[in-house]
Amino acid sequence: MIAKVSNKSNKSNKKEAVFKRLAENRYAKFQYEISETIEAGIELLGTEVKSIRNGNVNLRDGYCSFRDGEILLLNVHISPHKNVGSFFNHDPLRNRKLLLHKKEIFKLKSNTEKKGLTIIPLSIYLKGSWIKLTIGIGKGKKLHDKRQADKQKDIKREIKTALKR
């Protein structure tokens, strides 16, 4: 007897992508006024993947730059994996290629050149089994802008406490 197999996919069998945030750049939200965010993949080595999954990554000083039609993630520290010898381990501050479509790269490049914007890594997370990076396009805040943002946060906090009473 031959069983018929239908080509229709069963929605109940599909697994939903699970998001697990591994690191976040809180400093970027204070330093920059972020106008747009984009999800990008990262080209990583095996020991880097293990280290990121353990949460040993620092995005604070990171930024993105263009080279030969590609976008690179610079100055992001991914600690060497502990259980691997030094010969097989990676360089913690090496340049990592971001995986984006050509149109997205062109759009980012034109925005940064014309408007004087910066591309900053905001967070790194797991999407299913893939490691993804959220990059933000933003402009650096001046000192008075930072002070004004702090004052507004304090005012909102005072209003919330007053309403709770």
UniProtKB/Swiss-Prot annotation:
SUPFAM superfamilies: Small protein B (SmpB). The keyword Cytoplasm applies. CDD domains: SmpB (cd09294). Pfam families: SmpB. Keywords: Cytoplasm, RNA-binding. NCBIfam families: PRK05422.1 (NF003843), smpB (TIGR00086). This is SsrA-binding protein. It comes from Prochlorococcus marinus (strain MIT 9515). The gene is smpB.
